[in-house]
């Protein structure tokens, strides 16, 4: 496989982040905890997303060598290029009688976590504290609702 590919490193079971980096790949942090949203089954708080950074992984797979602990790679590793939220809507239909309600719930979960992701990926060193980012989100979300609802 060409090393020109950018890979999403997520579960740290099949291929671990250190092995991908050692093999020369550039990676995007797609850590299960706290970056996955499986509405309404599994998700982590906006504050947990804020406290995460692109050099930390917390897998959920029971056979991961990093289960129940945080894997950290060296800060400023140039081949870790960012992170992402991951929303899996496959549990919505089974958990919401009205599909539109489930989609709306997932949209809110993503929206309130996106600013926390941005603070961690646009700024490798946080520029604002959690309370400030949360307040800014609440202000812009209120404006969005006034416009769209």
State where each predicted segment sits.
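Flexible, acidic glycine-rich loops studded with aromatic residues
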Residues: 1-149
